[in-house]
Amino acid sequence: MSATYPRFALVACVFLVLASTVAGRADDLTPRPTMGEILRLDAEADEILAKDATIEVLASGLDWSEGPVWIPGDARQPDGGGYVIFSDVPQNRVHRWKEGTGLSVFLTPSGYTGLPGYSKEAGSNGLALDRQGRIVFCEHGDRRVSVLTPGGGKRTLADNYQGRRFNSPNDCTIDAAGAIYFTDPPYGLPEGPQDKKFRELDWCGVYRIAPDGGVTLLTREMTFPNGIALAPDGRTLYVAQSDPAAAIWKAFPIQDDGTLGAGRVIADATAMVGRHRGLPDGLEVDVAGRLWATGPGGVHVMRPDGKLLARIDTRMACGNCCFGGDDGSWLYICSDAFLVRIQTKTRGWR
């Protein structure tokens, strides 16, 4: 989602990969600036966040940062990996931030390859890594889920449901078998939720792309499904709803055939809307199954049942987060025009 709104065909694309630094530090010799505060709301918070933890600012000057994913250092990455990438949705690009190097443009265009002026939110949004170490993109403008191929182009994984184009795929998560779960709100359409000209689906769905490419509509019951994540055992799917009137997170049991059982609301932040910046958006899950979910007032750290343990408040709207770093214990947060991070005492489960 963005701050503006409540907020297998081979496709030939040309991508420009730059080495320019954008408002990011290339050195690590002095302390980084910090922002916001950490609110500890349960004793368990001290088990996962050090008492002296701070929110470090890594980069600024972005438009609307989103969809971070950690690229591990391994032989599958042509450049060696060891960095975080994330989308700047309005700018239609993906940035890379690496320790000791700072911020650079990783890929552009990232989510829209048509004529200029289509949408204010045309770039890629959510990003993920598949089992082969390839980057999967949720693309607003091109209205598809795609994968970056070793040759540098993209291959479409899915761009329609029963012949009707998706709204604007927003965020995704991938299970152990390679199935991709993704959300499809309308934020990337030219008129956003009010779009009548380009919109082809009457709902905002949550979908599953099977390893063989088949697309299944899992649910259409959520008004604006947004962030999405899996529990460590792969049996529960968490979905955030970025609706100011019902700012909730739901948990769905995953059946043996990949479909969803009845969802239940595990947390409701509707009362915080308007008093704090942001709405339920991207989320991550740690090894203990706790949710680190962006929402009103920052990142809500919750138990699987929704019990709130802490809130990481950057004082800005937060769009998404991911675990990363060499041991997976840094939480990288996309917060409006900033990329920030906080050291935790846990790690992502992947």
Language-model-derived ranges and their functions:
Residues 9-20:
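Bacterial N-terminal signal peptides
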Residues 24-350:
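Sequence-structural signature of mature extracellular/luminal beta-sheet repeat domains
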